Design a protein with these regions (language model features):
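Alpha-helical sensor/transducer elements of the RecA-like P-loop NTPase core
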Residues: 1-3
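Amphipathic alpha-helical "lid/sensor" segments that cap RecA-like P-loop NTPase cores
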Residues: 6-49
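Accessory nucleic acid-recognition modules appended to NTPase machines
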Residues: 33-177
Length: 177
């Protein structure tokens, strides 16, 4: 006999499952819920969003002359979402200074592409010295940066959950650090 979990018995389960699958693949931008868009249209929208973010928003925010190192960092962080941040390793990988990596990470945070999640320790002093994690805030954008079309790693799932908690906490103005 097959015993189903309670939530699967709910009449709304198929709709909830479809909504979850959509969210997992395309993220949370409202434009992507347009029912006239097919799957390919949504991927094109996400790719365009990432390009617009780089070409217009980042240039306006920090006046970068060369976007290549920034794009490399953005991709490296997307690959490492949900992981501890190692600034030195990222600097070596991208070919820039640690100071530049820290600036770029700050730009990603200010533009709501990522958040830094401090390690959790009861002792506030320890919390300051422990290595934080970095999380991408939108799974659809993450997928576009990595040129993926579905599928999710454990770290990507962790980032999806962390980003939702972060958004909900910010919505009610709770301190999320």
């Amino acid at each position: 006999n097959l015993i189903l979990p309670f939530f699967m018995l709910d009449k709304r389960y198929p709709q909830m499952k479809n909504a979850w699958t959509h969210y997992e693949r395309f993220g949370a931008y409202p434009a992507l819920t347009d029912e006239s868009m097919d799957e390919n249209d949504r991927y094109v929208w996400l790719d365009t969003y990432v390009k617009t973010y780089l070409e217009r928003d980042v240039r306006d925010l920090v006046a970068l002359r060369d976007l290549e190192p920034y794009m490399k960092l953005q991709r490296a962080i997307a690959l490492q979402t949900g992981c501890l941040i190692n600034v030195s390793s990222l600097a070596t990988e991208i070919g820039v200074s640690s100071k530049t990596v820290k600036q770029y990470i700050e730009y990603l945070n200010v533009s709501f592409q990522t958040i830094i999640l401090p390690s959790w320790e009861r002792n506030q002093q320890k919390r300051l010295v422990k290595t934080p994690k970095i999380h991408c805030l939108d799974n659809g954008v993450l997928q576009a940066i990595l040129h993926k079309r579905g599928g999710m790693t454990g770290n990507e799932f962790e980032s999806l959950v962390v980003s939702e908690i972060y958004k909900q906490a910010n919505n009610i103005r709770a301190n999320v650090n």
